[in-house]
Amino acid sequence: MNWLELVTTVCGATLGTPELAHNIDTVATEYKVDRTLILSVVWGESRCKPEAHGKSDDRGLMQVVPKWHGRRMARLGVTNLFDPLQNLRTGTDFLSALRVTEDPAHALAIYNGGFTPPPRSHSYANSVILRKSEYDGLLNGHEAGS
C-alpha cells in the first residue's frame, strides 16, 4: 500500500484526498515528524474532518485550541485552524516542540491533556502509538502483527 492509499483507507474516499496526503507529507518533512504519527493523531483527534469543532474550542484536523496556541499560531502566520494545512502545521509544530520523536508516549499525552496529563491522556497516547504501528505495517506491505 502506498501513502495515498493509506490516507484514503484511514480517512475514507471523501476525506482521504491527495491534498490531505500531500499536506501531511509537507508538515512531516518540515518538522521531521513521522507522517504515520501525524495521520494517527489526525484520526484520533478529528476522524480526518477538517471542520471538526470540539467542546473546548478545539478546531480542525488536529483539534488545536486557539486559547492555548495563540502565540504559536501568530509565529506561524496561522489565521484559520479549519484550513487543513494551517491546522496540520500548528499541531505538528507543537508535537515537534514536545520532542515527540524522543518520547512519543509522553509527548502525545501532553498534546492531548496538557502539561499535567490525566490518565485518559496516557490511554490516548497508547492508542495513537498502536495506530501508528498499524499504519506503518500497512505501508510496509503487511498487516501489523502478522
Residue ranges and their predicted role:
Residues 2-146:
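Catalytic glycan-binding domains that act on GlcNAc-containing polysaccharides
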